[in-house]
A protein has these predicted regions:
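Reductase modules of NAD(P)H-dependent flavoproteins
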Residues: 17-118, 124, 276-384
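Short, surface-exposed secondary-structure boundary micro-motifs
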Residues: 89-92, 129-131, 182, 235
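Short, structured interface segments
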Residues: 113-136, 228-230
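Ferredoxin-reductase
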Residues: 138-229, 247, 283-285, 310-314
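Short, conserved phosphate/pyrophosphate- and ester-handling motifs at nucleotide-, phospho-/glycolipid
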Residues: 174, 257, 348
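A short, basic/flexible loop-to-alpha-helix module at the beginning of a structural domain
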Residues: 234-245
Length: 384
């Protein structure tokens, strides 16, 4: 009897084991079929640089490029500025929400994509002529401590954030960081000091304009105080001057778009760069030119720099005797031939787009010598 039971148990155990193994095999085959039908990632090839990267399913191409240290061109990362626009040579993508001015229906039909909001559905090949060398600096997440808050204008503060001593945060003048807010929201700001002028303790400088109703700036202007901790991630962006370039430079800023322009000027001065530089800073009224004295001092310290502030709507109380009008139109009046120049523009998207269009059409600026960082607020972004 015991032997019979033992045989039956052996048969049952064997059958159960076979069933389990069969289930595991079928599950593995099902997963393989699902993986083949719905791959977890796609291969994106970048031409003419002949670079490749793996893009996770449902991940925008640009985010994968940043993660891999591959330097695709970009600006806002929100589908608003069009700086990341490139041509899709092969494969298929779908776009997240974006502004028509960044990518029109005609451009999309012609094969152009915005890498900041394009997710691949197949392996793809794209054409991006501005791909620089991969990953010079690592993108880091870190806590920072508010070192100082200075009111520079009625609606502008200069914020200095102390960097943690255990992090080697490196960046180029002109690059930006993201504030990581509660709920995962982010706000981007450009550094206003060059990496050669961090001071002691090492700190980055940011210029914040108050946007009433803004998730971050309402808090920054009403409640932020020294020693508060803010989490950041960076550096991001490719708005930077290369020391190997030799052409005369036009720096074009509107409002707090002056921040990365200031950092670039500091970098040029510390390099001992002798290229002719013109700084045009456009604001609405005199109070908006919140670091006018700094710019005047820079002009005295740099023999190759000419500083031109421009007001679009000066008030009678301003007693303004300087230039008046749209800042990019003042540039065109002063420099009707820009065929041998480089232009670096930062500020409101409307100014950046107008400058890019008009300086090329009316002043002969080569398309590949216009470099831009268009500031986008939450109002400028398109939310899915």
């Amino acid at each position: 009897m015991g032997a019979t039971i033992g045989v039956l148990c052996g048969v049952l155990c064997g059958a159960l084991l076979d069933a389990i193994l069969g289930t595991l095999v079928r599950r593995a085959e099902w997963r393989a079929e699902c993986s083949a039908a719905h791959p977890m990632s796609f291969r994106v090839q970048i031409q003419p640089a002949n670079l490749g990267l793996e893009v996770q399913r449902d991940e925008p191409i640009l985010m994968a490029a940043i993660r891999h240290g591959v330097g695709l061109p970009y600006g806002c990362r929100d589908g608003a500025c069009g700086s990341c626009k490139c041509r899709l040579l092969a494969g298929r993508v779908i776009h997240g929400a974006h502004q028509p001015k960044a990518l029109s229906e005609v451009e999309e039909l012609a094969g152009f994509i915005l890498t900041c909001c394009a997710t691949p559905q197949t392996d793809c090949t794209i054409e991006a002529h501005q791909v620089p060398a991969a990953g010079e600096f690592t993108v880091l997440k870190m806590p920072t401590r508010v070192l100082s808050i200075t009111r520079a204008a009625p609606d502008v503060i200069v914020l200095r954030l102390q960097l943690p001593g255990n992090q080697n945060f490196q960046f180029h003048a002109g690059q930006s960081i993201d504030f990581i807010l509660q709920g995962g929201a982010r706000r981007s700001y450009s550094m206003a000091n060059s990496p050669t002028r961090l001071g002691q303790p090492a700190a980055i400088e940011l210029h914040l304009r108050h946007m009433p109703g803004g998730l971050f700036t309402d808090h920054a202007f009403a409640a932020l105080k020294e020693r508060d901790i803010l989490r950041i991630e960076g550096p991001f962006g490719q708005f930077q001057v290369k020391p190997t370039d030799t052409k005369p430079i036009v720096l074009l800023a509107s409002g707090t778009g002056f921040a990365p322009i200031k950092a670039i000027l500091e970098q040029l001065q510390d390099w001992g760069d002798a290229r002719p530089v013109r700084l045009y800073w456009g604001c609405r009224v005199r109070a908006d030119v919140y670091q006018h004295a700094w710019a005047e001092q820079a002009e005295m310290d740099m023999p190759n720099l000419r500083y031109v502030p421009v007001l679009s709507e000066p008030r009678e109380a301003d007693a303004w005797r300087g230039r008046v009008g749209l800042v990019h139109e003042v540039v065109m009046a002063d420099l009707p031939d820009l065929s041998g120049h480089q232009v670096y523009a930062c500020g409101a998207p409307v100014m950046v787009h107008a400058a890019q269009r008009d300086l090329a059409l009316r002043c002969g600026l080569p398309a590949d010598e216009f470099f831009a960082d268009a500031f986008t607020s939450a109002a400028d972004r398109v939310l899915a």
